[in-house]
From Swiss-Prot:
GO terms, molecular function: structural constituent of ribosome
Homology family: Belongs to the bacterial ribosomal protein bL32 family.
Gene3D superfamilies according to UniProt: Single helix bin (1.20.5.640)
Any Pfam family matching the protein: Ribosomal_L32p
The organism's taxonomic lineage, starting at the top: Bacteria, Bacillati, Mycoplasmatota, Mollicutes, Mycoplasmataceae
Domain of life: Bacteria
NCBIfam families found in the cross-reference section: rpmF_bact
One of the GO biological process terms: translation
Xref: SUPFAM superfamilies: Zn-binding ribosomal proteins
The protein's name in its UniProt record: Large ribosomal subunit protein bL32
GO cellular component terms listed in the entry, alphabetical order: large ribosomal subunit
InterPro entries assigned: Ribosomal_bL32 (IPR002677), Ribosomal_bL32_bact (IPR044957), Ribosomal_zn-bd (IPR011332)
Keywords: Ribonucleoprotein, Ribosomal protein
Organism per entry: Mycoplasma mycoides subsp. mycoides SC (strain CCUG 32753 / NCTC 10114 / PG1)
């Protein structure tokens, strides 16, 4: 089984991992109730999408 010839330094390891960071989720406010939702998704609070009720939400 192959093994690394030299130890990977901390800086080389961190440079390799520099692109692995997660980005924050983008959120927008619902046009009907003002709750924060993902773009292009039905609002979980009121069931509206593009100013139309598409899902009945029980109170």
């Amino acid at each position: 089984m192959a093994v690394p010839f030299r130890k990977t330094s901390k800086s080389a390891k961190n440079k390799r991992r520099s692109h692995l960071a997660l980005s924050a989720a983008s959120l927008v406010s619902c046009t009907n109730c003002g709750a924060m939702i993902k773009p292009h998704h039905v609002c979980k609070e009121c069931g509206f999408y593009k100013n139309k009720e598409v899902k009945v939400v029980e109170a």
